[in-house]
Structure formats: C-alpha cells, structure tokens
C-alpha cells in the first residue's frame, strides 16, 4: 500500500500508541512527532521491508548529527536514523557495522544488524536492529571487544587505514592504506587534523616537529593491527538485557588496537571490570598509558 491515502492514516490511528493523537491532516501531531520524516520516506521504508505501514514511530533523543526514531512494525522494532547533510555519514556507518560484525563473538558482544540503507533525494536513511539497553557490569563488553580485536587481527589485510572515506562525528576521516602504523597515524589522521585547523600555530615547521616527535615515540612500538570501533567512548557502548556488551555508532579503521582503549578513557571512562577482561586477552604493554 502506498503511504499517501486517508485509509492509511485511519489504520495507523487505530493501532498506534494511544499517546499519539489520531491524525486528521498531514500536519497533525502524529506527523509532527515524525519530525520531518516524510510520507515518501516512510513509503520507501515500507516497500524495502515488505511492510504495509508502521505500527508506531517514536522519536529518540540524544544525537546531534542525525534525527532518530524507534519504528515498530507488527513483528519487529527497528532503529531509524536520518541525515540530510548529503555527506554519506550513514552509508559509512552501515559499512562499519557490517564489517565489525564479521569478527564478533555473539556470546559476549552485540553490534546492531543493518536492515536497510536508503538514499532518497540525498536524504540518508539507515535502519538497524533495535536493542534495549540495560545497566549490567561491563565484563562481557571488555571481553567481547578483546575478541573482536583478536579475531580481526588474525585475518587483517596487513595494512593500516581504511579503503573508504569516513567520519568521526562530523569530522572527515581520510581514506587510504599504509603498510606501517607510523605512516598511517601521521598521514591519515594527525596531519590532516592539523591542516584542517587552518591556524598559524600549525605552520609547516610546527607540523614537521610534531611528525618527528610522533615517529620517535612510536619507533619501537609493535602495534596489533585490528579493526577498531574508532569512536569508543561511553556514549557509544552499553549492555543488552542479557548482559552482553553492545557497541554502536562506529568510525572504524584498521589501526593499533590501543586506539579503542585510549578512546574509552574519554568522558569518564569505562568500569574497572571492562579493562580487566580486555587485558586478559591483550595484556598491558609497557608504554600503554603514554
């Protein structure tokens, strides 16, 4: 059924949550609740999933880059993300999620399954598995991340970097592959970041000093080349109803596994048991804190 006729509105009104008023026109509270999720987009989603209409749509707060909703059909709940910036943020996220899922042990770590991706007139829509989050300890989260790093490291392409242009937040992540960690870290991450600041304090001489300092610090470092989440702060991780770790909103690349551990130290960090379980798989090396 095309989501453009009055019977569709009536049918939804009869079955959606009572908290949502019955729609009378397309400017009713029901569609205000959809926050610019257009009827054309809803119709495209339904056709992609082989569904006739959503049972309910509820806006989800928390992100500052995308709009998001929980969308429920008769037999499933999905998380819908929508972006209008025309920069392929969600296409990159889809790619990262699909690649990370190849290396997880599902007994300990969950990564949302990608259900569908659509680009409708430069508006991106990503549908992924909805996961109810709970407050458990972080043992399985730490163990699951360690297992992901270990399995990906065992089958990695022997190159550092990533084959597609990416993002961390709204910041571009340069694509490319290097055969060693120092060149990757400098050429694909540090130098592009410094150049993007366009500040006089980062002139050519200063950038060269930064390069030499990083080279000297990493010269004797022997990294584990793993597929990392890439943006693993506490807001992008949690636990499901079974106590399994959950990670989402990735900015993946092939990198030193310590990239993820360093990121977990931001904004309050993770719990003690997370690090204990992770370091059972990857023991702490000299210089980790540095």
Residues covered by each model-derived region:
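Alpha-helix boundary/capping motif
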Residues: 2-7, 12, 21, 25-28
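Short acidic/polar mixed-charge low-complexity motifs
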Residues: 51, 74-78, 244
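Conserved N-terminal boundary motif of the eukaryotic protein kinase catalytic domain
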Residues: 50-59
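ATP-binding pocket architecture of kinase catalytic cores
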Residues: 58-183
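An alpha-helical support segment within catalytic cores of ATP-dependent transferases
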Residues: 38-49, 153-228, 240, 280
């Amino acid at each position: 059924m095309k989501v453009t006729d009055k019977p569709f509105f009536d049918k939804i009104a009869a079955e959606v949550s009572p908290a949502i008023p019955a729609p009378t026109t397309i400017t009713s509270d029901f569609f205000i609740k959809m926050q610019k999720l257009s009827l054309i987009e809803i119709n495209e989603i339904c056709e992609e999933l082989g569904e006739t209409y959503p049972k309910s749509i509820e806006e989800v707060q928390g992100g500052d880059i995308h709009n998001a909703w929980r969308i429920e059909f008769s037999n499933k709940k999905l998380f819908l993300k929508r972006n209008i910036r025309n920069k392929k943020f969600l296409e990159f996220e889809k790619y990262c999620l699909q690649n990370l899922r190849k290396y997880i042990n599902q007994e300990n770590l969950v990564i949302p399954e990608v259900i569908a991706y659509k680009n409708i007139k430069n508006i991106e829509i990503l549908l992924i598995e909805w996961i109810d989050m709970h407050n458990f300890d972080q043992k399985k989260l730490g163990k699951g991340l360690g297992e992901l790093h270990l399995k990906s490291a065992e089958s990695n392409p022997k190159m550092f970097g990533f084959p597609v242009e990416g993002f961390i937040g709204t910041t571009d992540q340069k694509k490319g592959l290097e055969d060693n960690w120092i060149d990757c870290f400098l050429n694909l991450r540090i130098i592009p970041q410094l150049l993007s600041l366009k500040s006089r304090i980062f002139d050519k001489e200063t950038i060269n000093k930064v390069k030499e300092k990083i080279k000297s610090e990493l010269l004797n470092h022997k990294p584990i080349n793993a597929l990392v989440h890439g943006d693993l702060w506490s807001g992008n991780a949690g636990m499901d109803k079974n106590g399994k770790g959950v990670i989402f909103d990735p900015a993946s690349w092939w990198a030193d596994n310590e990239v993820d551990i360093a990121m977990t130290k931001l904004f309050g960090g993770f719990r003690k048991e997370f690090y204990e379980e992770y370091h059972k798989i990857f023991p702490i090396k000299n210089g980790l804190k540095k």
